[in-house]
């Protein structure tokens, strides 16, 4: 029986490259001359910290990192950006966590979306991934198209496709 897994994974090497490109971009921008601004990528916490001297610059830096991540193939929905900008001393900072894996609540919504489509497939939650099995490849491809168009606020990848 054909099957595939729905996962949400992020390549940390690509994130690191995007952060380095964004840092390089900051050094060439005129509006960031003589300003203390930096990006910090924490691989263990899976987060990007944006720090600058004003909240407006933090917002600009967030746009820069989003653009660089998109160029590297990481969708904007992969970032979980904190709502408020933290201010301490003369610096403003913002944390953006990377969404890795599928949470149980999101997995339940995913399974419900698949079941509501009335396609002849079964979806099972297996840890941080969802396995979809069906009798025909066409049904599985229809599920893939459904998930790509469904707005669940997180990018999904399909792997382990078996025929």
Swiss-Prot record:
Cross-referenced Pfam families: DUF520
SUPFAM superfamilies, alphabetized: YajQ-like (SSF89963)
Protein keywords: Nucleotide-binding
Domain of life: Bacteria
Regions that span the bilayer: none
GO cellular component labels: cytosol
A GO MF term: nucleotide binding
Listed InterPro entries: DUF520, UPF0234-like_C, UPF0234_N, YajQ-like_sf
Keyword Nucleotide-binding (UniProt): yes
CDD domains named in the record: YajQ_like
Parts forming coiled coils: none
PANTHER family (alphabetical): UPF0234 PROTEIN YAJQ (PTHR30476:SF0)
Purpose: Nucleotide-binding protein.
Family the UniProt entry places it in: Belongs to the YajQ family.
Annotated protein name in UniProt: Nucleotide-binding protein HDEF_1968
